[in-house]
């Protein structure tokens, strides 16, 4: 009787140990593919979040941080907004998008050239929200989290 139980346990353990485990592949954020502009926006969001954390530090010194790699990436990314290929080809069919990009670029310049103040940072974020109220509404809640209170 004991040998039957032992034999049965060995068979069960071998059955479960020999099964292949399927590797879970993460689903893409956009099942239709990610456009150049979408990827750039995600990069901007990541870098801006890091900049927000830098500004919120107690001993934040703008003169030290303005040369930070994330500030440099912000400058680099903002210049790519006009050329980046959007998911929706109609996005650039009018001047509306390019005007929003100009406003955003102005706010980034103002932020970086005026001692990196909180109100200039929040103005930059508000320009993001203004554009996203016209295009891609779903990200506004994420952008709002970038504001400094």
Predicted regions and their residues:
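Extracytoplasmic c-type cytochrome modules immediately beyond a signal peptide or single-pass transmembrane anchor
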Residues: 21-123, 141-149
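C-terminal motif of bacterial Sec signal peptides marking the signal peptidase cleavage site
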Residues: 15-17
């Amino acid at each position: 009787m004991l040998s039957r139980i032992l034999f049965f346990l060995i068979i069960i353990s071998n059955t479960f140990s020999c099964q292949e485990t399927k590797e879970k592949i993460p689903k893409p954020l956009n099942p239709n593919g990610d456009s150049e502009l979408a990827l750039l926006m995600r990069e901007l969001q990541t870098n801006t979040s890091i900049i927000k954390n830098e500004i919120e530090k107690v001993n934040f010194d703008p003169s030290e941080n303005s040369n930070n790699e994330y500030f440099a990436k912000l400058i680099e990314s903002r210049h790519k907004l006009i050329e980046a290929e959007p998911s929706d080809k109609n996005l650039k069919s009018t001047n509306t998008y390019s005007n929003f990009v100009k406003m955003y670029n102005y706010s980034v310049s103002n932020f970086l050239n005026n001692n990196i103040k909180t109100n200039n940072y929040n103005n930059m974020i508000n320009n993001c929200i203004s554009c996203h109220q016209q295009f891609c509404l779903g990200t506004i809640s994420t952008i709002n989290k970038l504001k400094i209170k």
